[in-house]
């Protein structure tokens, strides 16, 4: 896991639902916690593009529902600014499920993937069809 090259606005608090855009069988996940988040007392953990989150599968196949999984956020609706001044935002909030070692659990990623997430997680970047 590498450091991010841009300052991504954190827009996904605990309880936010994300579309799961890989072929693991999960369709919708809900954020439980954010790995590596350092905040102040009573502040909710928030995640942004490229962050590792712990999530619960809310919709999907029968064997995937109610599973607690690790996931990487690859798209967010809230715009964020890159180092060159370009502002980036997507149509939805989306994530992909990964193993505890950081390897993509599925074999494909549907839709575009943010460049920040692909740089930080090489297995996600290699499976992506579109990088933005």
From Swiss-Prot:
Pfam family, any one: Ribosomal_L14
SMART domains, A to Z: Ribosomal_L14
GO annotation, cellular component aspect: cytosolic large ribosomal subunit
One biological process term in Gene Ontology: translation
Coiled-coil segments: none
The entry's keywords: Ribonucleoprotein, Ribosomal protein, RNA-binding, rRNA-binding
GO MF terms, alphabetically ordered: large ribosomal subunit rRNA binding; structural constituent of ribosome
Superkingdom as given in the UniProt entry: Archaea
Described function: Binds to 23S rRNA. Forms part of two intersubunit bridges in the 70S ribosome.
Subunit-level organization: Part of the 50S ribosomal subunit. Forms a cluster with proteins L3 and L24e, part of which may contact the 16S rRNA in 2 intersubunit bridges.
PANTHER family xref list: 50S/60S RIBOSOMAL PROTEIN L14/L23, LARGE RIBOSOMAL SUBUNIT PROTEIN UL14
Entry's family note: Belongs to the universal ribosomal protein uL14 family.
HAMAP family (UniProt xref): Ribosomal_uL14 (MF_01367)
Protein's recorded name: Large ribosomal subunit protein uL14
Lineage of the organism: Archaea, Methanobacteriati, Methanobacteriota, Methanomada group, Methanobacteria
Gene behind the chain: rpl14
